[in-house]
Every structure is written in C-alpha cells, then in structure tokens.
C-alpha cells in the first residue's frame, strides 16, 4: 500500500510539472509585418478592403491604441486606404516583463471604436487578445471577418 501511495505521489508531481510547463504561453516569433501577412493569408482579395500597413509610433499611438502611455517594443496597424470602412487590426509586441493584462485592459477601455468617418464598431465587438507578449486589437465591422482574424491570430 505504501508503494502505491509513493508511485501515485510521484506520478502526481510529474503530471503537475508537465501541466505547468505546458500552460506557459510562448512568445510568437516573427516581425509584425510577417505576422500580419500570416493573419491575412487565408483571405481572398475580395473579402477585404484595400489595406495599408502603418507602423505605430509615439505620434500615432493614441489613434491606433487609444492611449499614448502604452509602452511597447514594436507595433503595426492594418487599416483600409479608404476611411469609410470600419476595419483596424493592430499587432503590439510588448516589452519584456510588461503587464500584458494591464495593457490589454487599457487598450480595450480607451481605444475609439468609432474613429472612422461615418462608421464604427460596437464596443462589445472590439477584440483584444494576446499570445505571449504579442497583443492583437481587432476592430472590424463584419463579424465573419472579425472572427476569422481572431482565429488566424490564435493560430500564429
């Protein structure tokens, strides 16, 4: 009986260690440009507006993320060339040791989902998620496109 308890204890510890290491989310490798290209890879040309990629910097961060105090390593926005279409995807690579949950909350609370002329996205349709130190902000009017982008991000 003692042997069974010891074996059970050892197996339990091994299982816990395995689960704890499996749950640690790894950072997604690649430049913002490479990752953005992967996110859009499964879209047909006629499914999307004509998009432009814009580097997010201290001059335009408030427009894209809602708050100039967000610190990041790199960020890239994908937006339509015609501003009458509600479509914005922003990838943000945070600095090492950043409070990712805090940054996500700040983005979700402060970003303007009605920043375009005449169109917008409902606040509840704003998606802010992360994989490791990579955060995505998705504000897209079309639900199918929005969900497809979310899935593409989660599959990076």
Regions found by a protein language model. Give the residues of each.
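Gram-negative bacterial Sec-dependent N-terminal signal peptides
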Residues: 13-15
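Soluble, non-membrane globular domain cores that form compact, hydrophobic packing
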Residues: 6, 23-156
């Amino acid at each position: 009986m003692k042997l069974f308890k010891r074996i059970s204890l050892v197996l339990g510890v091994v299982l816990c260690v395995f689960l704890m290491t499996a749950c640690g989310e790894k950072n997604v490798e690649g430049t913002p440009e490479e990752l953005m290209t992967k996110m859009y890879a499964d879209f047909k040309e006629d499914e999307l507006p004509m998009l432009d990629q814009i580097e997010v910097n201290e001059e335009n961060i408030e427009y894209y993320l809602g708050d100039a105090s967000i610190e990041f390593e790199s960020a890239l926005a994908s937006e339509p060339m015609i501003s009458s279409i509600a479509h914005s995807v922003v990838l943000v690579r945070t600095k090492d040791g950043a409070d990712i949950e805090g940054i996500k909350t700040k983005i979700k609370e402060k970003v303007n989902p009605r920043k375009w002329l005449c169109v917008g996205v409902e606040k509840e349709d704003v998606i802010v998620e992360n994989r490791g130190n990579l955060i995505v902000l998705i504000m897209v009017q079309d639900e199918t496109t929005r969900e497809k982008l979310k899935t593409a991000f989660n599959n990076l």
